[in-house]
Amino acid sequence: AKALDKMLKNLSSNEAVLVIRAFTYFLHLINIAEDLALLRVTNVSDGNEDHSPGSLNHMFSRFDREKKQNTEILDVLGKAHISPVLTAHPTEVQRRSVLDAEKKISEILKKRNALRKQENIGDLGDNEDSLKSVIVQLWQTRLLRFSKLDVADEIENVLAFYKSTFLKEIPILYKTIERKLGNQSVASFFRMGNWIGGDRDGNPNVTDQTLDLSVKKHGETIIRYYLLEVHLLGSELSISKKLIGASNQLLELARMAKDPNPHREDEPYRQALIGIYSRLAATLVKLTGAHARSHALPPSIPYNNPGAVSSDLSVVEDSRRANKGERLAGDRL
């Protein structure tokens, strides 16, 4: 202890900063490893009868023991309202560059665990090289910002979490619950909340303009997500009406799309989804002023409400199910 104390006292200012940075990143890496270890334990326990507390499996096992009926659970969920509220505070400490690098490290470590199970020595070596590369990147990345974020920056930062987490995981949550309830539809009980750009706790930088910006940016993020999903769905549903039938509603939706491409004239699902995509793109312009990326689009009428989008997608879904397509693009729909 005395030797360490003496060594630390003899450090120059620059050396002390390096030591502090090293320990900071070391703790970050330890946290990533601990999170992944906990995730592995949870995944293992989910495969056993003794499910880990807090998991959906544990919760539904308890429902079974208490002989809860699906109708009771659906009724409670129909009245429930869970709303995680995002604030700027968690995003002010770390830079986006640091968070992105740490996310990449986490993804590499997840792949590493799978490669170990496969005993794939060659790919393990490549994985280790990738891991070292990102750690070097992290070490050479500035940890702190030189200037404070403004409200617009805070809005952009928090929206990154929607893209990386919420938009992917919330549908999985609903699907898992619905499967456990006999594939019955569950009411929308999980709704995101957000203070950024609209909080009224005395922040002098929050105005009606920042609130308007926040609402538009959130809308743009959600609509762009749907645009991407509809585009991917169109690439998956390459169904020819010469080979399988389609509902009259689906054929009408395809006709209304006015798709000029002759190569898709026998593919009503793609035509219908092009129409849905075009209307979503028009909605994006109307509500946010932003434009959809790429893809030549015919002029379309914007959607007036979310129910109209859902209705069109239901036409695609119902036709798919009625014409031997239950296994087609089920997850995405």
Regions found by a protein language model. Give the residues of each.
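Often metal-dependent polyanion-binding catalytic scaffolds in large enzymes
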Residues: 1-333
